[in-house]
């Protein structure tokens, strides 16, 4: 009976451990993002409230059709210098393929605005 209680206690402790999706001190912003370019910039990133467990973080992002990411900076709705969270293998999200010249032009404008914001923050 004692061994059962010890095993049950250890099992509860193992499953009840909190999960830090972004343990990297630099890339510590947990975001739900859409497409990106080589993890340099991710688009349409939003902060979502989630429990500190892995499946809820992934599920929260999946509800909006996005993927969990850990980013260095979030400016406007873009995540800069991002990576997949610990324990997560996202599908290839570095496939941003704008349809038409207007979308590409808008994308380049957004990137320019983000870089200006970063420069303003650094000054």
Curated annotation (Swiss-Prot):
SUPFAM superfamilies: Hydrophobin II, HfbII. The keyword Nucleotide-binding does not apply. Induction: Expression is not affected by carbon nor nitrogen starvation. Expression is neither affected by a deletion of Hyd1 or Hyd3. Expression is induced during Bionectria ochroleuca self interaction. Residues 1-16 form the signal peptide. It is found in: Secreted; Secreted, Cell wall. Disulfide bonds join 22-70, 32-61, 33-45, 71-82. It comes from the Eukaryota. Keywords: Cell wall, Disulfide bond, Secreted, Signal. One of its GO terms (cellular component) is extracellular region. InterPro entries: Cerato-ulmin_hydrophobin, Hydrophobin_sf. Its main location: secreted. Homodimer. Homodimers further self-assemble to form highly ordered films at water-air interfaces through intermolecular interactions. Belongs to the cerato-ulmin hydrophobin family. Aerial growth, conidiation, and dispersal of filamentous fungi in the environment rely upon a capability of their secreting small amphipathic proteins called hydrophobins (HPBs) with low sequence identity. Class I can self-assemble into an outermost layer of rodlet bundles on aerial cell surfaces, conferring cellular hydrophobicity that supports fungal growth, development and dispersal; whereas Class II form highly ordered films at water-air interfaces through intermolecular interactions but contribute nothing to the rodlet structure. This is Class II hydrophobin 2.
